[in-house]
Amino acid sequence: MADLEAVLADVSYLMAMEKSKATPAARASKKILLPEPSIRSVMQKYLEDRGEVTFEKIFSQKLGYLLFRDFCLNYLEEAKPLVEFYEEIKKYEKLETEEERVVRSREIFDSYIMKELLACSHPFSKNATEHVQGHLVKKQVPPDLFQPYIEEICQNLRGDVFQKFIESDKFTRFCQWKNVELNIHLTMNDFSVHRIIGRGGFGEVYGCRKADTGKMYAMKCLDKKRIKMKQGETLALNERIMLSLVSTGDCPFIVCMSYAFRTPDNLSFILDLMNGGDLHYHLSQHGVFSEADMRSYAAEIILGLEHMHNRFVVYRDLKPANILLDEHGHVRISDLGLACDFSKKKPHASVGTHGYMAPEVLQKGVAYDSSADWFSLGCMLFKLLRGHSPFRQHKTKDKHEIDRMTLTMAVELPDSFSPELRSLLEGLLQRDVNRRLGCLGRGAQEVKESPFFRSLDWQMVFLQKYPPPLIPPRGEVNAADAFDIGSFDEEDTKGIKLPDSDQELYRNFPLTISERWQQEVAETVFDTINAETDRLEARKKAKNKQLGHEEDYALGKDCIMHGYMSKMGNPFLTQWQRRYFYLFPNRLEWRGEGEAPQSLLTMEEIQSVEETQIKERKCLLLKIRGGKQFVLQCDSDPELVQWKKELRDAYREAQQLVQRVPKMKNKPRSPVVELSKVPLIQRGSANGL
């Protein structure tokens, strides 16, 4: 029966994988719902306050670029050729061979540069033209040949073109997507969890599918009780920090994190799914690798280490078991549990795996940095070639003996190693950090320039264009079955409790890596959801044409901000009422959807603007004179933050203004009133008073 269950789990998992690759959007079991277009009023202020409404910020985001591109290509004729030129350059930069670049560079020059020069309409500098011409004459076609044009294209786009984008519906759509992104609160219900694919000290790893996009991931679940039992709280939190540091920027050689979230019992990392097994497994199945095969793996691992070191992260646990293969056979560095940030303070702890640890790591009290990883790389490459670490002779398992040999033994390299390989390993395995390859001031570049890698084009390595030595078999789960992986004994943690103080440790654990979420959405459901939302909004506009749209009321007035919130202002009401709110310098107005009358609350009536919590949901509490309360609930975190800020600012400024104006005796206070007409307060005045 157990065998049958294992087979069914494998089949289900493999089917999910195949469908996810073909049509991930069709596999989405939940839909992303974009908020109303009116969210723009709140989100634009929220993003502006954080310096996010700039050309550089929006153009560098995947969804921002796609919407800006759509606007330029379809709605702004003068920007269309600039964006087309930009996209052709980006395609050129990804070409694999010099021959392809020679042909394509000439085509780009003729179509986008020479044509404009002949028409006397070339909007770029003479320096940019001469730069490209000079290289083409010499038949030099580096990937960054057109970089001067990239800079000038962006310069031309960041002025009037960007301003027109900000005023367009495409920026409204950007605000809608950013609101969704900034309000992500993941739970287990957001994933379909498949079979177990691995187990570690604190928990287990499963294959899973994200419900709203259909994308497949690995879910690493750490048991909070097991963490507490092993006093591993610092390690668990450190792994989340290290993953957040290395998971930004383009690096296909690290198992990166897209999300982190928590449940009452677990901490979960959502990671890149690697289906090809690890190098330790393949070493045991395949036998030792040739120099050429090892070179292929080494090159990709070096780029992974370079990405970490550029972010001041030292990995500290490089070994074949931590190098995972994807379905195509390319490798990624996994498991950052022992990684450390050395940007402010160098570590000195002796951590890692015996046989791969650098001498400075083994020596107590000695500080180190990325140097440790280059020594470990030398040990690992030796193992791929010989089947054992250079300091683990005769299969000894005595850790003290292995450490002693690491600190004292001069490594003897076999005569069968090529001179280039010997040079590389001798450089990496130097006990003296000041003489070690990778530690002489230029980091990974020193290793990449080793004669052993002379035959490689590092751009081709980065683009994963070289065929890998080993392609994992398709249609198989390259992991042990659930029975062999085993499970934890729940009796171990039966008596362990998790009081509030323990849960508080993980309060800031949840995280979404923005660029990875945007990439996931762009690859799966972006076009579908945009098309559906366009249809819904068009229908709603037609429906609201007679009554007028809620946003129209704010036009031409001194409205600070407007948008939907839910209110609970009447003591006899127990349900939330969704209303459209308008914040003015001296009052807050609201109305129901499709309703003409407004309700009004003046700033003079408000005593304070506070944050409260109702049924574990953050709300805004407006205390009103006479002991009354007015509670508001927002649909998303950014809305709550911005409404709280703007209400407090308006209230404070109104109070300051009142203090400057002489008080009138016996003036009655205005109650909360229903308005069927424009209020007597002059709406078009500078401050409404």
Curated annotation (Swiss-Prot):
Disulfide bonds: none
Entry annotation: catalytic residues: D317 (proton acceptor)
PROSITE patterns in alphabetical order: AGC_KINASE_CTER, PH_DOMAIN, PROTEIN_KINASE_ATP, PROTEIN_KINASE_DOM, PROTEIN_KINASE_ST, RGS
Keywords: ATP-binding, Cell membrane, Cell projection, Cytoplasm, Kinase, Membrane, Nucleotide-binding, Phosphoprotein, Serine/threonine-protein kinase, Synapse, Transferase
Site (Required for receptor phosphorylation): D3, L4, D10
Reported regulation of activity: In contrast to other AGC family kinases, the catalytic activity is solely regulated by the binding of substrates and ligands, not by phosphorylation of the kinase domain.
Subunit structure: Interacts with the heterodimer formed by GNB1 and GNG2. Interacts with GIT1. Interacts with, and phosphorylates chemokine-stimulated CCR5. Interacts with ARRB1. Interacts with LPAR1 and LPAR2. Interacts with RALA in response to LPAR1 activation. ADRBK1 and RALA mutually inhibit each other's binding to LPAR1. Interacts with ADRB2.
This protein's name: Beta-adrenergic receptor kinase 1
Protein's organism: Mesocricetus auratus
Protein's gene: GRK2
